[in-house]
């Protein structure tokens, strides 16, 4: 029976129906699984992160700079745009009113108003000191000869510093003649030394700072009653382009000196004021 079957009986045996299907099913299953495995998984879209370092800064406009930073106007800038104007009696009147407005009543302020008659002709910025003094005081020689009272002067010139006082004294040569001139400032000169000099002989002309002159009046070293002319070095400017009345300390001392009888002397018409 074994011989009937033959040696290669398996080769002629029909393939079972399930075999191809199984093989095909396996192949299809593998293909299907492969396709599933090879489908790309969609990646999550990343939101762009904002980098603060890479941001481009917008240039600041001129308007924003101006609003943040305000530059104070300098006197030099103001003078560069306008011509210098000589001082006037109205300038002094305004300063007096502004200085005393917070401490004096309305009636007292009216009493401090200086009469126009007490003001001499002002410097129009064309004069030297000698030429200006000759114009406002043509009878100086006669006054100088008749003045013999000690502890007093005929004319006072107020300025802002000792250095400026020395400059003014040097420029007085053409005017003073034989008049005795005295330095009235604090630099290198003690008050007591100046008091002794004023007691020793009659002085015709004094040039100095309001602070030292005020101190001499306080110590009875200087009597203001014989004074005939009080001249302010009004228009001159220092290295910072400040006039003497632009400096708060000097301005305060000037008004303190005016309070020591100058106002009453002006109203009695015995004292004249000049703005050089």
Curated annotation (Swiss-Prot):
<protein>
    <recommendedName>
        <fullName>Protein CMSS1</fullName>
    </recommendedName>
</protein>
<feature type="modified residue" description="Phosphoserine">
    <location>
        <position position="23"/>
    </location>
</feature>
<comment type="similarity">
    <text>Belongs to the CMS1 family.</text>
</comment>
<feature type="compositionally biased region" description="Acidic residues">
    <location>
        <begin position="1"/>
        <end position="10"/>
    </location>
</feature>
<keyword id="KW-0597">Phosphoprotein</keyword>
<keyword id="KW-0488">Methylation</keyword>
<dbReference type="Pfam" id="PF14617">
    <property type="entry name" value="CMS1"/>
</dbReference>
<feature type="modified residue" description="Phosphoserine">
    <location>
        <position position="19"/>
    </location>
</feature>
<dbReference type="InterPro" id="IPR032704">
    <property type="entry name" value="Cms1"/>
</dbReference>
<feature type="region of interest" description="Disordered">
    <location>
        <begin position="1"/>
        <end position="91"/>
    </location>
</feature>
<feature type="modified residue" description="Phosphothreonine">
    <location>
        <position position="209"/>
    </location>
</feature>
<dbReference type="InterPro" id="IPR027417">
    <property type="entry name" value="P-loop_NTPase"/>
</dbReference>
<feature type="modified residue" description="Omega-N-methylarginine">
    <location>
        <position position="164"/>
    </location>
</feature>
